[in-house]
């Protein structure tokens, strides 16, 4: 299946392009109190090394806003301020931040939005219209309830509001906590505008539930060419958010980066400690950014076939096994020596590609 992405306008968050032909970026949000400068920077650095492109922070009051100014000066990543209720905080933060997210359901009057737009326009920073099914404006929830119809009305109303103020550096999110409703909301809005979309399932839950919901919703949308930046929302799991997001991009075939591990589910034919081997391989290869297919198989039934499609592979047997590279056997070793040799071949494969580039 050919992947064809919906062509959107391009905006810029710090040094990260979003929309157009830009790669789909991955975002996260800190769970520190923003006024905790040291703690916030520690989490930003963790996200940076995990492979995040953009970070969002909450701003509840002026103490947060002033701290955010200091955090921004030391951050290795572009920062977006997340504003609810108090538009004055957005106006203040626009002086130094890379982007603003507003919730149309609680930002207040048109005059409030006008002030935010003026500040962002002067700095040349974008605004995300963050529509959330749990906080729709009363004028739309009264008429449509808290479903997708109300979300669409809210999105189009607020898009027009910004456009009427001659502001077009816009991205949009349509988040619900339900995978099907999230898909429907983004699909129905996509033909109505050409602004870039920020994909996400809100309040998705802990690691297990978030991974399932986000994979269904975001994977579905990405395969339809919808989405320009994304976040996998996950309770208290910073690095895992990035890891799952990158895996969704890779396994949907949208973006190739990092290691794709093919491993068998195990059965009675296995005569080796495959589970331990896979855990070691996952841990030792998670730093690799180069797109790489590797195969870790527990017996010969499918191992050789999978190895033909892998860059580097292990085929375990009884007390011994094969290391295979691009379909060619490079070593036959005792089981205890297999993983180390396999990892050495993986690193050599990465180095050989870097040299060619």
UniProtKB/Swiss-Prot annotation:
Q: How would you classify this enzyme at the top EC level?
A: oxidoreductase
Alphabetically ordered keywords of this record:
4Fe-4S, Iron, Iron-sulfur, Isoprene biosynthesis, Metal-binding, Oxidoreductase
> What does the record give as cofactor?
[4Fe-4S] cluster
- UniProt lineage: Bacteria, Pseudomonadati, Campylobacterota, Epsilonproteobacteria, Campylobacterales
Cofactor remark: Binds 1 [4Fe-4S] cluster.
Tell me which EC number(s) this protein carries. 1.17.7.3
Q: A GO molecular function for this record?
A: 4 iron, 4 sulfur cluster binding
Q: What does this protein do?
A: Converts 2C-methyl-D-erythritol 2,4-cyclodiphosphate (ME-2,4cPP) into 1-hydroxy-2-methyl-2-(E)-butenyl 4-diphosphate.
What protein is this chain from? 4-hydroxy-3-methylbut-2-en-1-yl diphosphate synthase (flavodoxin)
Q: Which gene encodes it?
A: ispG
Pathway the protein contributes to: Isoprenoid biosynthesis; isopentenyl diphosphate biosynthesis via DXP pathway; isopentenyl diphosphate from 1-deoxy-D-xylulose 5-phosphate: step 5/6
Q: Please tell me where [4Fe-4S] cluster binds in this chain.
A: 264, 267, 299, 306
What PANTHER family would the database entry show?
4-HYDROXY-3-METHYLBUT-2-EN-1-YL DIPHOSPHATE SYNTHASE (PTHR30454), 4-HYDROXY-3-METHYLBUT-2-EN-1-YL DIPHOSPHATE SYNTHASE (FERREDOXIN), CHLOROPLASTIC (PTHR30454:SF0)
Catalysed reaction, written as an equation: (2E)-4-hydroxy-3-methylbut-2-enyl diphosphate + oxidized [flavodoxin] + H2O + 2 H(+) = 2-C-methyl-D-erythritol 2,4-cyclic diphosphate + reduced [flavodoxin]
Give the family from UniProt. Answer: Belongs to the IspG family.
For whether the record's keyword set contains Membrane, the answer is: no
**UniProt cross-references to HAMAP family, sorted A to Z:** IspG
GO BP term, example: terpenoid biosynthetic process
């Amino acid at each position: 299946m050919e992947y064809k992405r919906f062509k959107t306008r391009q905006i810029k968050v710090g040094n990260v392009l979003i929309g157009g032909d830009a790669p789909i970026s991955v975002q996260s949000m800190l769970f520190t109190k923003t006024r905790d400068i040291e703690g916030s920077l520690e989490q930003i650095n963790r996200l940076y090394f995990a492979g995040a492109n953009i970070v969002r922070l909450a701003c509840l009051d002026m103490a947060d806003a002033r701290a955010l100014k200091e955090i921004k000066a030391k951050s290795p990543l572009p920062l977006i301020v997340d504003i609810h209720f108090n538009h004055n905080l957005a106006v203040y933060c626009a002086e130094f931040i890379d982007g603003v997210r507003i919730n149309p359901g609680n930002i207040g009057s048109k005059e409030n939005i006008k002030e935010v737009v003026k500040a962002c326009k002067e700095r040349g920073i974008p605004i995300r219209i963050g529509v959330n099914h749990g906080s729709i404006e009363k004028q739309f929830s009264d008429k449509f309830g808290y479903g997708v119809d109300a979300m669409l009305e809210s999105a189009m109303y607020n898009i027009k509001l910004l456009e009427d103020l001659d502001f077009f550096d816009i991205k949009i999110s349509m988040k619900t906590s339900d995978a099907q409703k999230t898909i429907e909301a983004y699909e129905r809005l996509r033909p109505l505008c050409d602004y870039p979309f920020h994909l996400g399932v809100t309040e998705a839950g802990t690691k297990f539930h978030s991974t399932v919901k986000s994979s269904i919703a975001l994977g579905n949308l990405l395969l339809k060419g919808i989405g320009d930046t994304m976040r996998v929302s996950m309770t208290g799991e910073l690095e895992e958010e990035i890891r799952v997001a990158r895996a969704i991009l890779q396994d949907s075939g949208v973006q190739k980066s990092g290691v794709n591990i093919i491993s068998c589910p195990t059965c009675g034919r296995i005569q080796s400690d495959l589970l331990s081997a896979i855990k070691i391989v996952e841990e030792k290869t998670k730093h690799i950014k180069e797109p790489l297919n590797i195969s870790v198989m527990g017996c010969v039934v499918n191992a050789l076939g999978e190895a033909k499609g892998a860059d580097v592979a292990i085929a375990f047997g009884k007390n011994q096994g094969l290391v295979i590279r691009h379909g060619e056997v490079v070593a036959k070793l005792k089981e205890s020596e297999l993983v180390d040799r396999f990892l050495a071949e993986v690193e050599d494969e990465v180095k050989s590609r870097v040299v060619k580039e």
